[in-house]
Amino acid sequence: MDKLIEKPHGLVLVTGPTGSGKTTSLYAALNKLYDPRKKIITIEDPVEYELNGINQIPVNPKRGLTFAAGLRSILRQDPDIVFVGEIRDGETADISIRSALTGHLIFSTIHTNDAVSSIGRLVDMGVEPYLVASVLEGVLAQRLGRKICKECKQQVPISNDLSHRLTPEERTMFTAG
């Protein structure tokens, strides 16, 4: 992920189920990239956390401020980095793709079951496949793993094939419960 967020331009997507930490991961990326000399703007529904030094705009469809309309407005401000809370429709997808083509670094989330399906989803939204290929830098598929309580946790054996590739400390990390 570190290599993806350091790109000068392009589209970086995070996918996963609701509540899997997609926005949190992208907020961490924005915080890491923050520099007062960079113009970073977000359009979100809703703004989940306040990020210092980053201009965050909440979507408000009742007033005509959709992701697409907000993104158009943001691009007139010539940002370096844009975070689009979610690509939900063809118009937002198209604007995001074209923004990445014109030198912006775009982060967003998209609802698919896995990383590869994100490409098909963008194409289904009407984005030309060659445009997706031109700008998509990477897709992170994210899930949250369950944490096993201390009382239930038991170390489990691992295969010899895996064991020889791990440090002694890493070998103790495999637990079930």
Write out the residue ranges for each language-model feature:
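Short, flexible helix-loop junctions that flank or precede catalytic/ligand sites
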Residues: M1-G177
